Amino acid sequence: MPTVFFAQFGNQDFGTWGGVSVNKEVVDGLNVDADFQVRTDDNSTRLNQYFLDLGAKYKVNKYFRTGISWRPRMTNNWSGYKLENRLYLDLTGKLKLNDISLYLRSRIQTTSKRNAENPTYQRIRFKVKIKLDKGLKAFVQDEFFFHLNGTGTSNYKKNRFGLGFEYEISDYLQMSLKYLRITEVNQAYPLRMNVIALGLSYSIE
């Protein structure tokens, strides 16, 4: 029992994520956005990666939204930084029940790495958002990562659980603060990553 427990939860780390994003509605229902982020690991002492997300989202109706995003990112693999390119395709469903909003997102993620495997994942995320007060919302989410072109007995590779708050500072500026617990699964020595993430988002009229 103790051996199994430490094999599952003994390998842990802590990191911090910070990001600034800008978005604008270019036509009715179509938004474009840019998001710059930095992420640390090794107990938040090492810069693990930084990247820029450039994307667009289209609101089909009040229930469905689609999106596409391109992410050039620099990753630190201990011997230096390497450039990777990542592409996302999203389909998100939303159901609003008074002050509670329910979300289900399916994301296809593919990464281009020079001289390496180009992994493709499907990510399924469930999210519940609750309005607490004017401009203040709380949320809880859980996301599952499936390696579509991987090998092994199971394609389920990672879980990302999170909870946090969103606060509208003004009509144009929003802040978010959240905790994430990212756990590798179906691996001999899985890593559990604990993350505190802070984000600022500005909407251009």
Which ranges hold each PLM region?
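Transmembrane beta-strands of outer-membrane beta-barrel pores
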Residues: F36-D42, W70-N76, L95-D99, I108-S112, ...
